[in-house]
Amino acid sequence: KGKGVGTKRATGTARVITARDGVERTFHQGDILVTTATDSSFMPYIRKAAAIVVGPLDQNVNSHAEVAGMALDIPVIVCNAKVVDFIPAHSLITVDAEKGFVYKGIPKEE
């Protein structure tokens, strides 16, 4: 659970990035970017991403990930927790920015 930015939902493969070595070969269009923080060097991956999950960050301050997500109209979840420790790499996840949730797999519709 975190602060959602936007109202969209996206499902894709979690690409957990802790170091950018070799990322350009493994990050694909529609993947979900999972990392501790972003900056302008992440833009090639953010442009391909279906969504962004980032943390731990202060939820009261607009982060680079939030601004980039709003500009590109992709869902973003900002968490207090270190998301790279909780979201398994290469797992199928769904990001629901309206609710501020990240789900394992595809959630059943309510």
What positions do the PLM features span?
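C-terminal amphipathic alpha-helical interaction region
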Residues: 1-2, 74
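Acidic, glycine-rich flexible loop/linker segments
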Residues: 8-31, 36-110
